[in-house]
Amino acid sequence: MKTSRLKVLIPIFALVLCGAVVLFERYGVKYNPSKSTTIDLNKVYTEDVNPEKECMFLFSETEGDEYGQEVETVLEGMKIPFAKYSVEDTTFVEELNQYQTLVFAFQDWTSIDEDLPDIMEWVHAGGSILVTETPYLNEAFQGVSKELGIEGFRGSYVGISGVRFDRECMIGAKAGDVFYFDGEDAEKIEVTLDVELSESTQRYISSENGEYPLLWKNESGNGSVVMMNYSTIARAQRGFFATAYSLLKDACIYPIINGSAFYLDDFPSPVPGGDGAYIERDYGIDIAAFYSTVWWPTVLEWEKKYGIKHTGMIIEVYSDTVEAPFERNKLTTQFVTYGNMLLNSGGELGFHGYNHMPLCVKGTDDDMQFGDYKLWASAQDIQQACSELSQFAENLFPQSVMQVYVPPSNIMAQDGKEALLQACPEIRILASIYLPSEDSPEYLQEFEVEANGIIDTPRITSGSTIDDYQKITELGELNFHYVQSHFMHPDDALDVDRGAELGWKTLSGEFEKYLDWVYSSAPNIRNLTGSGMGLAVQQYDYISMERRMDGNTLNVKLGGFSDEAYFMLRNNGKEIVGTKGCTLEQINAEQYIVHATASELCVIFGE
């Protein structure tokens, strides 16, 4: 998250005179007014389909539903129709034959001890179970452990600090790759049973040292059991849930976003002040010259190398004014120059704020005051400031419609949000953050369309150095939503908390390692602007699905369909011999990206 601090305007002559000329000559990037790049978000969608529920979701009222809610979020995102049952309701097993899959989202199997024989008989007949939490080590669980692929128990619970892939089962991870939850030296989490698997069990993921199995599949009669042998409540886990569920059947298809977006917060803006000691140390130039001759050329190189389309988030002034009147910034040369260069390189502009004060009102949002930021005097003042920003941007970029808004420091209260949308009805997309923070009241989001039509497109990663938690979350998101969303600030190279002491050469090099990983893992992911990401999320969120396996053909009927949609397909064995209504692109041995161009599609498998 952006460090809270006030900023001051510094001279911009070097930025304008030197930077613009250098970039024009070196890259041939024009900075004359751009044609409109506005994306139409007013699509027409077909009626929803209403499929029969395929999954029984089993939870415990005694244990609570916090963990289960994360699993539910994944099933809903995969558009898996499910029905919830409580283990305390002893009649659930009588209805099991109505479903194809069964998800366990609880740990104490004692409550279903008498039902386990019937459940395993259902598995033998062709049902599939996904165990999403490490079970308690008791007689009920141990009594059926052989059916779950467990040969024996070597001990009780053990600690883990990450995951190691035994085979390539997720996009972004090859066999032998290790991903840590919170760093290699972080305290281990005791959430795993020390078990030995049977020889016939398929092992997919182990602990970071390869010692303890974490995800495996065991065939049992005509059915199967997939076990997750670790329990963590975090958004980073969602992609692992999606992967585990997709292993249950011979083939699994679910909708994805298919998009990669990069945001430049505070750009264009007045050139911020800050500690330029490390810039002076490494380059012998001031901050303005660094932005124009080093930082911005690097950004353009990333666009050229990876096909990135940046979305720049405008800040009009760096002031702490939170009460009308709101003065117009008349120093606009750097806005026009860099804004139009960004537009002409295929990017987009959006709103970040009149200034960098989060939209929270004094007296009603006092609990959201953070750092040195001021609270706004009233919702009316927020509305006036947002109107000023809108008029400022329209004057400078008359052919662009600003549809995307990023809250300053990713903080925004409900009354501030309402004032923003009243002042700027052109805003259709809110892009805040996906991962929670312990030290600030951030505006957390899901990838979804709100009831009022506003599209939420959270950012997952940030900065130049991507830590272990961000990376394992992004790994999960490549497999859950097939999405990458990142933001950085021009002044990251000035902030010690964001790695300034390392120097820009090191910071940019570290970030390129992340980019290399993303684009080698997902080479066909769509590079999108902020509004392009909004459209992709809208198309994803509106989709409904009816799946049916007829012999060797997977038939899919879509509702909430416009002109195209994307899906993840996992093929767990058979050869694919044909398709209708869609095209496939293989990512690894088991996973494919499906591009649907019709509301009915099918994937045909060999014998």
Where are these regions (language model features)?
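Metal-dependent polysaccharide deacetylase catalytic core of the NodB/CE4 family, i.e.
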Residues: 54-59, 124-125, 132-148, 304-415, ...
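A glycine-centered loop/beta-turn motif at secondary-structure junctions
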Residues: 53-55, 128, 187-259
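C-terminal beta-strand-rich structural cap/linker in extracellular carbohydrate-active enzymes
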Residues: 113-114, 587-607
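Active-site beta->alpha N-cap acidic-glycine motif
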Residues: 233-241, 248-341, 345
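Catalytic domains of cell-wall/extracellular-matrix polysaccharide-remodeling enzymes
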Residues: 11-17, 380-450
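Catalytic grooves of carbohydrate-active enzymes
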Residues: 229-232, 251-271, 303, 394-404, ...
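A glycine-rich, often tryptophan-bearing local segment used as a flexible ligand/cofactor-contacting loop or short
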Residues: 110-180
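Helical hinge/lid and interdomain linker segments adjacent to catalytic or ligand-binding clefts
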Residues: 60-138
